[in-house]
């Protein structure tokens, strides 16, 4: 019993024990301001957005929602792929796939949301 208490105490005081892994990545990714994150899953790799790296004036990342079971709930991901545009870590735009899990939003539409964020600072 004493060992169980020690083990539980260790788990409770371990830093970032309950912090989702993506939170650390998001902090680093969005450090420069605007970042675009595609949430997808391996089972839907055929519908992955391929133009994400073509976006300008932002950082980009693709995250597998199966890697962290809390991601769909934390980010309200109901269909994949879902693209979030984040400014300083906060969601400012969301683009979701249709019922066939195909992204209908275009690169130009996502880029426009990025450009609007930049223009709003002037």
Enumerate the predicted regions with their spans.
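Extracytoplasmic/secreted cell-surface and envelope-processing proteins
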Residues: 45-48, 72, 93-95
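N-terminal post-signal-peptidase region of extra-cytosolic proteins
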Residues: 65-70
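Structural micro-motif
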Residues: 75-87
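Non-catalytic, surface beta->alpha helical segment in thiol-disulfide oxidoreductase systems
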Residues: 85-122
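N-terminal leader/targeting and pre-domain segments
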Residues: 17-32, 109-122
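Local sequence-structure signature of Cys/Sec-based thiol-disulfide redox active-site neighborhoods
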Residues: 21-57
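Sec-dependent N-terminal signal peptides
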Residues: 4-12
């Amino acid at each position: 019993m004493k060992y169980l208490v020690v083990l539980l105490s260790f788990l409770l005081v371990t830093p970032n024990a309950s912090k989702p892994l993506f939170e650390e990545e998001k902090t680093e990714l969005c450090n420069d301001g605007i970042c675009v994150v595609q949430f997808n899953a391996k089972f839907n790799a055929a519908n992955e957005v391929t133009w994400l790296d073509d976006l300008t004036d932002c950082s980009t990342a693709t995250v597998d929602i199966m890697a962290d079971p809390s991601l769909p709930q934390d980010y309200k991901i109901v269909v994949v792929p879902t693209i979030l545009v984040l400014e300083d870590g906060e969601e400012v735009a969301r683009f979701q796939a249709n019922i066939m899990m195909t992204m209908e939003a275009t690169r130009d539409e996502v880029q426009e949301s990025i450009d609007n964020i930049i223009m709003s600072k002037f």
